[in-house]
Every structure is written in C-alpha cells, then in structure tokens.
C-alpha cells in the first residue's frame, strides 16, 4: 500500500511540475475533459432513452409512427408540388399554342418569355376588341370570292396586299386595270415604291412601318439572354398589328403617251414630257395584319431573317380620288362655303397648304409647296392679283380679291375668291408671310350677280392691256409652252419675286431718306416712288405697274424669235412687260441696280438655254462690252 501511494504521489508531482509541454497538455486536457463531459452527458441521455424504450415499448412505437407521418407528409407535399408544376407547365404550353408569336417559334421558349408575349398579344387585341368577330362580317350564304367582288364593286377600287418589311406587292385584284391600267401579273411581286411618286415614298413608308418589326423593341429571352424574334411588341395602338391605315398617295398610271410634234420648240422638252409617267391620286384605306410565313406559302429571300417572325402586311382598298367641286345649294339652305387656307412667302410661293385643298384643286400639298401662286392664275387675272399683292405687302389691312380663275390639276380652271393679310414680325418690322383664305365661288353666284362676289368681267384688265403694245405695232401673242395648259402665263413665277424686290427696294429707299424717320416703312403709299430719271429708279404706271422705257430695249428685239419664250434677255422682259423693271440704263458704265438685274437676266437665259428651255442667248443686253 505504501509503495502504491508513493507511485501515485510521484505521478501527481510529475503532472503538477512545470515543463515545456505543460501548457499544451493542460489545454488539451481541459478541452478533453469538456468533451468527455459532453460525451458522457449524451451517452447518458441515450442510455436513459434506451432504458426508457426498453421499459416503455409504446413510446418507441409512437416515435416510429411520428417519423412515418413526417415522411409521408413530405412525400405528399412533393407530389402536390409536382402536380402543380405539371399543371402550370401544361397551361403555359397551351397559352404558347394560342399566342401566334409563340406558336411560330422554331424552339421552345421559357415560361417568362411566353408570359411576356401573351401580355403583349392581349395589349394588341385590346384596341381591336369588338362584340363580333371577323367571321361574323360575312353572311353565311356568301362565299369569300363573292364577298370580295361585292366589296370591290361597292368601293369602286382595287384590293391590294403589301408586305410591310420591303413594300412588296403580294396580291392585287384584277380591278386595278380599270384604274391604273396595269394588269394583275404586272404588279404582283413588284415593289410598291417603284410605282409611287418620289415625294410620296416617305409618307407610304411611314404608314407601312410599325414597331412590330423594330429590332430595338424585341424581347429578351430570360434563359439565353438573346433577343427573341417576335412581331408584337409594346407601342402605340396605331402602330400595332391590326391598326387601321388611311392615306393618300400618287401612283403611276400606265396611260398610253400621246406623241406631240411641235417644230417650234426643242425636241428635248417633248421627249421629257412624253417619257414622263402620269400619276393619279389614290386613297388607300385598310389595316395591318400578321400571318405566320408558313401559312402564306411565299418564298422569302432571306429565310434566316424570316424564321420565327410573322409576316406583317397592309391589306387595303385603293380608290381613285377625284377632286370635289361643290354643287350649287338649292333654295334658302345655307351651306358652309368650301374653302382652304394657304400661306405664302412675300414673293407668292406656297409655304403651307391646307389639306382641304386636295379635295378642291386635286393637288396634294407637297405638289404646291415651293411653287409660285402666279403659275396657277389665269393670265387675265394677273394684273388685279398683282395689285392686291402689292397692297397686302404695303398695308396691314385685309385685302379681298375679286373672283379669279385658278388652274386645277386636270388643266381646267376653278373660280376662287381670296382674303389676304400679311403677318409682320414684331421685332424686325418686316413682313414674313401672307395668309390667304381661298373660297370657292359657285357658278350660280356668278350668274346671279351677287354684289358680294364681283363679276370676272368687272375685274381690272389684264396686264398686257394695261401697257402699250409697242411702237404702234400689233400686240405680242403669248407662245404656248409644252406641258403648260393654255390660260396661264409662261414664266409667271417670276412676277411675285419681282414685286417683292420692288417693294423691298421702296422700303430701303424710304428707310434711308431723312424725311422717313418719323413714318412707318409700310406707309409708303402717301409718297410717290422715285422717278425713272433717277439712277436705278422705276417708272410706275397706274395701279403701281412699272413701265419699260423705249430706250431700255434694243430695236427689233421684241419681234425676234417669237417661237422661243426665252431666246434672249429681252424676251424675258417681253413675256412679262407689266412687271418688268427698267433693267438697262442709258449709262452703261454705271453700276446701278438695274445693271445687276440685266446681268442676272442674261445669266438666267444662259441657264435656261443650257437646260433646253430656250434658244440662243443674245449678249447685246449686257451693260458692259464683252
């Protein structure tokens, strides 16, 4: 016993003595004790539970049943979730089959993309929702062909289908021959833009364009991150598939050209007129519709681009739009007068035309823009309208013209009556433009002698009758220019420009004189313009019409080359003697404004002769020797 005690004490002393490994052993011992405690506790609990199970077999059975119930509940939940996912997938597949854009896809789409396309399809159909479907339009006793013939007969036009991507004519009815004189085989497969007027191509492209085919609007696949090719994307309702379209455009008419031979004019002009295709105004009404390319049965040039995309087309009926001339109102029924509004520059050129002018004049607004109004006035009315032009530029009051004739598109004339007023810039105190309200005058009003509408015979004389015809010789006749119907004056577009320059020159002279400091530059009617004896002055006849002195023209120039309207610079003055300014001064060495105008007239003659619009140019009118 003593030896055993000694061994125990020595062991304890060795254990308690400090050493290099004491700290490590102590830390390990401490953690080991804790672990042993935990293990002992857990083993004790497990032992107690085992003892309890041995003692109570019912508790062990309940534990097993509890574990079984948990396992069964998990399996039932998994089955429920699986059935829910399967049902949701079946619904999404069914939804994808109902949406046209998803149905046309070559690959399977993810769920998010299908839902997006379905939402966009519902937005597209929202604007076209009606209590009746497309099939209900047609009665049951009518076939599709019979309905098509009835619609074409009632519309008095032709049916056409145009692809929105390239403007290709996919279908056109046989009735197009009655309007455009083209057969059905001539147009199918061709580009619509080849038969449109160049100024109307951009307008038609705007009508054909839709956000359906815009690449920047395509959806993104949630899985791959790549853009999804689709034909239905968010956008304004008027740009979605199924939106209605209504627009005017000019299309070529295959009319047989009439060969006109005139030896008095260059052959180049007649060739240009003969080769030029005539156009007619077509009113197209329809809507955009999409079909999958597999249902169209068409050969696409680029299958890679068309794969997975619907074919968006314009289905429309084209009708020949003829200008409307109002019928006389019978009895005491008062109807609103037919009128349109136009805006002109100070030289008379159109800068804005109301859309109502198309129904009255048969011109589209873009046809009139940039042209002078004097090109459409009858030559008998130019004198009165030129005087009104001067008055509206000099006063702030509204000027009402007499009834005058205006040339419409078919070459005939319509009677109009206009109210003009000028708009002055409040800062620059200069006239910016002229606003004209043009009213159609009915034939019965002219015949009845209504005092509010003066007779055409009561208008001032033409500009030729206001001026002397020459040195006692006969009055010069106006040559007929190819392509310009009779009744209008050749080169009349220069009249407005010369009137504007005349008024601006008077304003400049009055503005520079000391006596005009206290007066407005517009109130120039009280003081007469400068006399022709002054350098660069102009001699004005009654009504403000400038005269040409006899010394301003060379002898015999007024009778030379009567067949060529622009043979030389003097012929330009001879065509419009009523608005011509004294371009040639007696002193040819002075640098007056008239010399500059004479030089400009010679340059214009050179340009016209180079373009084939005139004959040889006579340089004798130049104010300086060559």
Curated annotation (Swiss-Prot):
- The primary site where this protein sits is nucleus
Phosphothreonine is found on 21
- Map motif Nuclear export signal 2 onto the chain: 361-369
- Which stretches does the entry tag as region Disordered? 1-60, 458-493, 511-596
* Matches recorded under Gene3D superfamilies: Helix-loop-helix DNA-binding domain (4.10.280.10), PAS domain (3.30.450.20)
Xref: PROSITE patterns: BHLH (PS50888), PAS (PS50112)
Report the residues modified as Phosphoserine.
Answer: 17, 78, 90
Assembly, in brief, is: Component of the circadian clock oscillator which includes the CRY1/2 proteins, CLOCK or NPAS2, BMAL1 or BMAL2, CSNK1D and/or CSNK1E, TIMELESS and the PER1/2/3 proteins. Forms a heterodimer with CLOCK. The CLOCK-BMAL1 heterodimer is required for E-box-dependent transactivation, for CLOCK nuclear translocation and degradation, and, for phosphorylation of both CLOCK and BMAL1. Part of a nuclear complex which also includes RACK1 and PRKCA; RACK1 and PRKCA are recruited to the complex in a circadian manner. Interacts with NPAS2. Interacts with EZH2. Interacts with SUMO3. Interacts with SIRT1.
Name of this chain's protein: Basic helix-loop-helix ARNT-like protein 1
Q: What is the lineage of its organism?
A: Eukaryota, Metazoa, Chordata, Craniata, Vertebrata
Q: Which gene encodes it?
A: Bmal1
């Amino acid at each position: 016993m003593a030896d055993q005690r000694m061994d125990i004490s020595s062991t304890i002393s060795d254990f308690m003595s400090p050493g290099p490994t004491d700290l490590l052993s102590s830390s390990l011992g401490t953690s080991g004790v804790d672990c042993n405690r935990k293990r002992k506790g857990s083993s004790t609990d497990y032992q107690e539970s085992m003892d309890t199970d041995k003692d109570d077999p019912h508790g062990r059975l309940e534990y097993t049943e509890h574990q079984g119930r948990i396992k069964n509940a998990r399996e039932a939940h998994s089955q429920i979730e699986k059935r829910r996912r399967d049902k949701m997938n079946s619904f999404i597949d069914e939804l994808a089959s109902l949406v046209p854009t998803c149905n046309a896809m070559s690959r399977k789409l993810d769920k998010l993309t299908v839902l997006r396309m379905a939402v966009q399809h519902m937005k597209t159909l929202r604007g076209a929702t009606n209590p009746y479907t497309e099939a209900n339009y047609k009665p049951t006793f009518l076939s599709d062909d019979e309905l098509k013939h009835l619609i074409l007969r009632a519309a008095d036009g032709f049916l056409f289908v145009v692809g929105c991507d390239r403007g290709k004519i996919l279908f056109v009815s046989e009735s197009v021959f009655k309007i455009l004189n083209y057969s059905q085989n001539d147009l199918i497969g061709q580009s619509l833009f080849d038969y449109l007027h160049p100024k109307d191509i951009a307008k038609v492209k705007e009508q054909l364009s839709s956000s359906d085919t815009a690449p920047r609007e395509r959806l993104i696949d949630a899985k791959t991150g790549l853009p999804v090719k689709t034909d239905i994307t968010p956008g304004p309702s008027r740009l979605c598939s199924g939106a209605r379209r209504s627009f005017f455009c000019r299309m070529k008419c295959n009319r047989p050209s009439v060969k006109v031979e005139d030896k008095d004019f260059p052959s180049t002009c007649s060739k240009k007129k003969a080769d030029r295709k005539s156009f007619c105004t077509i009113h197209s009404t329809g809507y955009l519709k999409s079909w999958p390319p597999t249902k169209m049965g068409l050969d696409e040039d680029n299958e890679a681009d068309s794969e997975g995309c619907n074919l968006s087309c314009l289905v429309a009926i084209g009708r020949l739009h003829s200008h409307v001339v109002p019928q006389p109102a019978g009895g005491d029924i008062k109807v609103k007068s037919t009128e349109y509004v136009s805006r002109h520059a100070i030289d008379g050129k159109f800068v804005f035309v109301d859309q109502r002018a198309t129904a009255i004049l048969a011109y589209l607004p873009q046809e009139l823009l940039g042209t002078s109004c004097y090109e459409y006035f009858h030559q008998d009315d130019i004198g009165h309208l030129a005087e009104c032009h001067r008055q509206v530029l000099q006063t702030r009051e509204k000027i009402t013209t007499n009834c005058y004739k205006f040339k419409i598109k078919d070459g005939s004339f319509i009677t109009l009556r206009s109210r003009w007023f000028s708009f002055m810039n409040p800062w620059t105190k200069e006239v910016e433009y002229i606003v004209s309200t043009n009213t159609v005058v009915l034939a019965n009003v002219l015949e009845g002698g209504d005092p509010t509408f003066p007779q055409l015979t009561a208008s001032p004389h033409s500009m030729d009758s206001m001026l002397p015809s020459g040195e006692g010789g006969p009055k010069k006749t106006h040559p007929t220019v190819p392509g310009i119907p009779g009744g209008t004056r050749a080169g009349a577009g220069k009249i407005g420009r010369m009137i504007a320059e005349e008024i601006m020159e008077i304003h400049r002279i009055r503005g520079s004189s000391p006596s005009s400091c206290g007066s407005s530059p517009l109130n120039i009617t009280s003081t007469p313009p400068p006399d022709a004896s002054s350098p660069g002055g102009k001699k004005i006849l009654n009504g403000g019409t400038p005269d040409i002195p006899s010394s301003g023209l060379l002898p015999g120039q007024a009778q030379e080359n009567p067949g060529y309207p622009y043979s030389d610079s003097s012929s330009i003055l001879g065509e419009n003697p009523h608005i011509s300014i004294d371009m040639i001064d007696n002193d040819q060495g002075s640098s007056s404004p008239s010399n500059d105008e004479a030089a400009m007239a010679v340059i214009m003659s050179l340009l016209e002769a180079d373009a084939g619009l005139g004959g040889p140019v006579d340089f004798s009118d130049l104010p300086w020797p060559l």
